[in-house]
């Protein structure tokens, strides 16, 4: 079984608000989505902005087969203690974890932690892909089992 660390980008207070209103947190959604396709993953969740035991997790990062750092409503341009904690934790992750999937906010934190700069877009963005075709290897992935591939092409 592969051990995956999921990093929560939102502040604890925001996640509590989501839960109180019947909305899944980003972390819960990631866990549910991945568990739907395989039962060969185990998950730990950490919130570097809120967790008091973050150093204990940092000391054990080598024990994870991979890491997923998801989204957040935070803004990388803000200079808050919570964001600084996330950037410092990402620096540890980049040194100790071989496989990192950074999604949206996670990518902004990864770029900043690596010394890069995230620039504001001139306008809003939406990730829309066109003319994507699933190749021979991709079609074997569990995501596409029993799927009508004519619906996948955009």
Which stretches of residues belong to each language-model region?
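Class I S-adenosyl-L-methionine
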Residues: 31-35, 111, 133
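Gly/Ser/Thr-rich beta-alpha loop segments that engage phosphate groups in nucleotides
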Residues: 72-73, 104, 108, 117-118, ...
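Catalytic nucleophile loop
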Residues: 94-114
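N-terminal beta1-alpha1 cap of cysteine-dependent amidohydrolase-like domains
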Residues: 1-88, 92-96
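Short, structurally constrained coil/turn elements
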Residues: 37-39, 112, 145
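Pocket-forming structural segment of enzyme catalytic cores
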Residues: 9, 114-154
């Amino acid at each position: 079984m592969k051990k995956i660390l999921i990093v929560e980008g939102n502040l604890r207070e925001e996640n509590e608000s989501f839960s109180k209103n019947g909305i899944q947190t980003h972390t819960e959604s990631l866990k549910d989505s991945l568990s739907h396709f395989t039962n060969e993953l185990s998950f730990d969740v950490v919130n570097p902005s809120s967790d008091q035991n973050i150093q204990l997790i940092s000391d054990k990062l080598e024990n994870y087969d991979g890491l997923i750092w998801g989204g957040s409503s935070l803004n990388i341009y803000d200079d808050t203690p919570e964001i600084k904690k996330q950037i410092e934790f990402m620096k540890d992750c980049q040194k100790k974890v071989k496989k990192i999937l950074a999604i949206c906010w996670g990518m902004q934190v990864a770029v900043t932690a690596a010394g890069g700069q995230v620039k504001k877009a001139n306008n809003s963005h939406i990730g829309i892909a066109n003319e994507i075709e699933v190749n021979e290897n991709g079609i074997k992935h569990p995501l596409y089992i029993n799927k009508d591939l004519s619906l996948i092409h955009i």
